[in-house]
Amino acid sequence: MGSKNGGLFRWFVFALCSALFAALTSILAKVGIEGVNSTLATAIRTVVVLAMSWGMVFLTRAQGGMGEISRRSWLFLILSGLATGASWMCYYRALQLGRASQVVPIDKLSVVITLVLAFVFLHEPFTAKSMVGCALIAAGTLFMVL
C-alpha cells in the first residue's frame, strides 16, 4: 500500500468507504425495490447519483476541466457509463428476484473478472498471489451461494 496522489493510505480509506457505501447500497436497494419495477428503480437511483455527482463537480469547481478531456477519454468514459448502466439494471433485477445474501457475492465476482481484464487489456501484473486471491474469491462466492 504505497503513496499515490494524496498521501499514504488515503486511497485505502476511500476504498474502504466505497465498500461500506456499496454494502449500504445493497441493503437499501433490496428494501427500496420491493414492489417497484427494477428498471424504474434503477432510473430513480441514477437521477440521485447524477445530481450528487454534478453537485460535487460544482462544489469542487471541477467543471472547468471538461474542455481538457480528450476524445479518447470521452469515448472510454461513455463506454464505462454504458457498462455501469447495464450492471445496475442487471443488479437491481437480480436483487428483486433473489436474496441479497446471494446476489451480492455473485456481483462481487466482478473483482475476479476485473483482475483478469486488467491483466489482458491493461497489461497489469497477474502474480501467483493474484491467482490465489481470485481462486479464493471465486471459491468463497460459490461456498456462500450454493
Task: Annotate each predicted stretch with a short phrase.
Residues 19-23, 27, 54, 81-86, ...:
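Hydrophobic/small/kink-forming positions within alpha-helical transmembrane segments
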Residues 96-97, 125, 141-146:
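Juxtamembrane boundary at the C-terminal end of a transmembrane helix
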Residues 1-17, 36, 50-77, 88-97, ...:
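Membrane-interface interhelical linkers
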Residues 24-48, 102:
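Juxtamembrane helix-loop-helix junctions in multi-pass membrane proteins
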Residues 1, 129-145:
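Hydrophobic transmembrane alpha-helices of multi-pass small-molecule transport proteins
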Residues 34-40, 90-109:
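Structural motif at transmembrane-helix junctions in multi-pass transporters
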Residues 13, 17-20, 44-48, 75, ...:
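Hydrophobic residues within alpha-helical transmembrane segments
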